[in-house]
């Protein structure tokens, strides 16, 4: 480690940009403390970790951070939430970082403390909660000697969130959807180039807000076409989606908590994401590469193609299963008893118990449907769904085994339903 380097705290280290920063700075010789809400995977990756939920009131206090920052000389704040409540957004972007910066300034000599805040391009022209709190976060950072670095669209070897959505749109079957006319400008920057810029700016800080983007400007259509070619897929017609339809999809995404499928993301795609590299970025010893250069720097693997094709299956599976549970619940609540009691005749189960079982099961099914549509604890809910399907299957196998022999499948259909639930469980783990 050179004399100029030191120990760096990375906030949001389990995110797409945060992980690239953690690995890149560690490879460059920095001692990295990776901080995130859940640190188990970062622990397994060999990082020193600091578990902290920036949305909690506790993390907004200087006392929480003091004593946890022993030896830390620099901070890189890569934490951010695109869609969240007003309270959570302000806590993550403003209050918790302010406490971190203040605590860091109290640990040793203030003049040796340097840091970078990864911010976002375009927030000056937007009045979304995300943009407002980003601007507030930048003001707090500047007041503590932390340099905001506004990044344009960030792509990388891996993908998450918006970059995953871009790959999914590029790999869409039969057509390639774009928002509006598809002529919006982008100058993507590679995550590895962003990491190199951050490493340099930590030891060569610049004054004021900086911006970083790639040197090549492409339209939305050109960017998705480039990603499609990289994935090895043939050309397809471009489907220009009306903006009103995209906004409606964004509202559905917000309601279902689908991350990058959100109103905020749609607004960004409507306008494009164009960074104007600042003087400090133009003076970097190693300039960022253009989109065409880095997208063709390595071949796409099977995992890239599979991920791109499966990414949009997550909302599809949620909606399909929600419809299944909704219909099942309504049937359980309102199906006349004369329709289902004959199926268990002779089983020894009292009619009142069978009716209660059907009605309570209907309520449970509707609750599961609601949880799916709201995106409430999706992975645990997948376990609940599997348990319910298995429970129904075992119960009906005992009470009415003839259901296995019905011409249209009967209980046999539960087997593919279990497979769909298992697939949803896998897809809900984005990290």
Question: Where does each model-flagged region fall?
Answer:
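N-terminal Rossmann NAD(P)H-binding glycine-rich loop of SDR-like oxidoreductase domains
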Residues: 8-28
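Conserved glycine-rich Rossmann-like NAD(P)H-binding loop of the short-chain dehydrogenase/reductase
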Residues: 30-37
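NAD(P)H-binding glycine-rich loop region in Rossmannoid oxidoreductase-like domains
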Residues: 40-99, 103, 121-126
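Conserved Rossmann-fold NAD(P)-dependent oxidoreductase catalytic core, especially the SDR/UDP-sugar
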Residues: 81-82, 91-152, 156
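Alpha-helical membrane-targeting segments
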Residues: 164-187, 229-273, 339
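A conserved pocket-lining segment of Rossmann-fold NAD(P)-dependent short-chain dehydrogenase/reductase
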Residues: 168-189, 193, 197-201, 205, ...
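Mid/C-terminal beta-alpha module of Rossmann-like enzyme folds, strongest
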Residues: 200-261, 275-314
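Extended, low-polarity transmembrane helix blocks
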Residues: 262-337, 352-367, 373-431
């Amino acid at each position: 480690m050179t004399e100029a380097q030191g120990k760096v705290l990375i906030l949001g280290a389990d995110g797409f940009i945060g992980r690239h920063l953690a690995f890149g700075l560690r490879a460059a010789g920095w001692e990295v403390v990776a901080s995130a809400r859940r640190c188990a995977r970062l622990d397994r990756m060999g990082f020193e970790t600091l578990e902290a939920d920036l949305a909690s009131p506790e993390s907004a206090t200087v006392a929480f951070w003091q004593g946890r920052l022993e030896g830390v000389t620099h901070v890189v704040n890569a934490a951010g939430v695109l869609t969240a409540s007003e309270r959570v957004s302000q806590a993550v972007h403003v209050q918790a970082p302010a406490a971190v910066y203040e605590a860091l300034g109290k640990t040793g000599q203030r003049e040796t403390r340097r840091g970078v805040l990864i911010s976002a391009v375009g927030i000056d022209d937007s009045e979304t909660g995300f943009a407002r709190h980003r601007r507030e976060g930048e003001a707090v950072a500047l007041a503590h000697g932390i340099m905001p670095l506004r990044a344009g669209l960030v792509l990388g070897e891996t993908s998450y969130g918006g970059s995953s959505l871009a790959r999914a749109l590029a790999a869409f079957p039969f057509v390639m959807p774009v928002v509006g006319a598809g002529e919006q400008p982008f100058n993507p920057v590679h995550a590895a180039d962003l990491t190199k810029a951050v490493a340099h700016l930590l030891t060569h800080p610049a004054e004021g807000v900086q911006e970083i983007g790639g040197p090549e400007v492409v339209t939305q259509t050109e960017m998705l076409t480039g990603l499609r070619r990289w994935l090895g897929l043939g050309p397809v017609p471009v489907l220009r989606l009306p903006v009103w339809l995209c906004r409606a999809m964004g509202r559905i995404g917000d309601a279902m908590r689908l991350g990058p499928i959100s109103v905020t993301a749609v607004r960004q795609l409507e306008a494009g994401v164009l960074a104007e590299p600042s003087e400090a970025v133009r003076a970097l010893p190693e300039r960022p590469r253009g989109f065409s250069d880095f997208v063709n720097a390595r071949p796409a693997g099977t995992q890239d193609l599979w991920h791109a094709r499966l990414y949009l299956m997550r909302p599809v599976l949620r909606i399909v299963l929600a419809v299944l549970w909704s219909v099942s619940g309504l049937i359980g609540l309102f199906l006349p008893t004369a329709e289902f009691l004959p199926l268990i005749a002779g089983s020894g189960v009292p009619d009142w118990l069978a009716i209660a079982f059907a009605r309570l099961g209907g309520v449970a099914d509707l609750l599961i449907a609601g949880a799916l549509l709201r995106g409430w604890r999706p992975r645990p809910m997948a376990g609940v769904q599997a348990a319910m399907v298995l429970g129904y299957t075992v119960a009906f196998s005992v009470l009415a085994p003839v259901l296995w022999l019905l011409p249209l499948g009967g209980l046999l259909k539960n087997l593919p339903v279990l497979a769909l639930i298992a697939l949803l469980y896998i897809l809900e783990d984005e990290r």
